[in-house]
Amino acid sequence: MSRQPDERAYVIAYDVVDDRRRDMVAKTLGSYGNRVQYSVFIVICTQAALLRLRRKLIQIIAREEDSIL
C-alpha cells in the first residue's frame, strides 16, 4: 500500500500506569499503526486522522498519571 501525499509517519510512545487504560491505549494505537516496541507505535496518517487519534487517547488516559509522546 502506498502512502497518500498528505500522510506523515509519527512515532507515538506512551507511559500509562493502569493496566486497563494501557490496554485501551495499545488497542487504539494498534488500530492506527504498528507496534515497534512494547510502548511505541509507528502511525502513518493524515493530520486529520492524527487529531482524531489524539482525541481518543485523551479520553482514555489519566493526565495526572499517564503520558503520551
What are these regions (language model features)?
Residues 1-11, 17-69:
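Basic nucleic-acid-binding interfaces
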